[in-house]
Design a protein with these regions (language model features):
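Terminal amphipathic alpha-helical/low-complexity segments used for targeting or macromolecular assembly
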Residues: 1-5, 10-11, 16-17, 53, ...
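Structural signal for interior beta-strand "rungs" in well-ordered beta-sheet cores
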Residues: 2-186
């Protein structure tokens, strides 16, 4: 169902039961899945792929070309999974030749005025609060929650089940299962509340706590801590996830908080 004041390029591919409100513009190389609602004054540009049962609120712009001077017009996409909600004035740029696409997973909530830049890979069940700004090439694991007005530096990796406090500047990688708080952004403990809500057992949570006590509280450098964890702690999916994430970190992980003269709480 579309409103007569909506413009839809004849080459766009819309599944059944897509509803589009007035004054929205949909370009030609666009695919929209069944049951999705598009609000008024939305612009959906070439290369956008939207899954089933999504909700796109007024003013959003999806699939615009990257804000990257190296972009040379290559054919790329912006892909959004199923059951994802994109609130007012969100912008999601399509990819560059680096990854070829920007991707937002299924069951995500991207709140108003947030920006997701080129080549980002956002997992499933993620929440970005109002005005979160994510630079290019960021990788964000499933079940990440980021508080409002935070900014994420390009190429940062954020592990799954992570909570990042509002107003944060994320310039280092954030390992999985933790809370990241304060300025400068620092380890704030294990995200126990979030893990309990998602069905993690007390044994699993305590195992994760043991791992991060070694990383942040035992006086080891990062390499020593990882070696100790592999040698001394029982193997588990959580242990392997944390160890692999830290070993592959390109920007280094956030540190334990250490109050300095210029720090702000």
């Amino acid at each position: 169902m579309t409103h007569p004041y909506t413009y839809i390029d004849p080459n766009a591919k819309l599944a059944p039961n897509v509803k589009i409100d007035p004054f929205t513009v949909i370009h030609g190389d666009v695919q929209i899945g069944e049951g999705t609602w598009i609000g008024s004054n939305v612009t959906i540009m070439d290369g956008t792929r939207i899954g089933k049962n999504c909700r796109i609120f007024p003013g959003a712009v999806l699939g615009a070309i990257p804000q990257d001077l190296k972009f040379a017009g290559e054919r790329t996409t912006a892909v959004i999974g199923d059951n994802t909600t994109i609130r007012e004035f969100v912008t999601i740029n399509r990819g560059t030749e680096d990854r070829g696409k920007t991707q937002v997973g299924s069951n995500c909530l991207i709140m108003a005025y947030s920006h997701i830049a080129h080549d980002c890979m956002i997992g499933n069940n993620c929440i970005m609060s109002n005005s979160v700004q994510v630079a290019g090439h960021v990788v964000m694991g499933d079940w990440t929650v980021i508080g409002g007005t935070s900014a994420v530096h390009q190429f940062v990796h954020i592990g799954q089940h992570t909570f990042i406090a509002g107003g944060s500047l994320v310039s280092k990688d954030v390992p999985p299962y933790i809370k990241a708080v304060r300025n400068p952004l620092s380890y704030g403990g294990v995200n126990s509340v979030g893990l309990k809500r998602r069905g993690f057992s007390l044994q699993q949570i305590n195992h994760i706590l043991d791992i991060y006590r070694i990383i942040y509280n035992k006086g080891f450098n990062t390499s020593q801590a990882i070696d100790f964890i592999e040698e001394e702690l029982t193997a588990s999916d959580e242990r392997d996830e944390i160890v692999t994430f830290i070993r592959e970190s390109g920007r280094g992980i956030i540190k334990r908080y250490s109050k300095g003269a210029n720090d702000e709480e």
